Amino acid sequence: MNKSDILLNSINAFYILPENRTILKELLNKTGGISLRNLEWFITNYSKKNNLTYKTRDGKLFSVHCAYKSSLDGYSKKLFDPFCRSNKMQYIVPGTSDKISTTVAQLNFIRWCIKNSIVDYIRNHHSDLFNKSGILQKVTPV
């Protein structure tokens, strides 16, 4: 087994949970109100510029940009990337018969966003982050 296969086993265990599966499908099918491009921009630009730190669901203090850089260093772009820049595969979403064209790197990135409450944060602050034209705007972090 290579790194990608080992990671995929862990990813499958994560996406077997219905709430995680739902968020994955919403992001990849563009039905949840958050695009992958906006998610990536929020993590790489907004969180760095605003030094964004918040408490996650389990009460831990989380610094978005620092954690992102640390995860990127640990996984590299080959295994941690919001966009399908490597070999795509037909991923069967655990617990369903749904197939999605994606990469291990993209599945891992989305898992990281869900686990660290980034998707929740963007949803809870959506009106503050986005203006009416759909562009992220600078706001003071909460």
Positions of predicted regions on the chain:
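Long, compositionally biased non-globular segments that serve regulatory/targeting/scaffolding roles
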Residues: M1-F80, Y91, V104
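Amphipathic alpha-helical interaction segments
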Residues: K49-N50, N87-Q90, N116, D120
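Surface-exposed beta-strand edges and their flanking turn/coil or helix-capping segments
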Residues: Y54, G95, L136-Q137
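Amphipathic alpha-helical interface elements that mediate macromolecular binding in regulatory proteins
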Residues: K78, L107-W112, N116, D120
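Low-complexity, intrinsically disordered regions in eukaryotic regulatory proteins
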Residues: F80-T103, L107
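Long, highly charged low-complexity segments enriched in Glu/Asp and Lys/Arg with interspersed Ser/Thr
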Residues: K115-P141
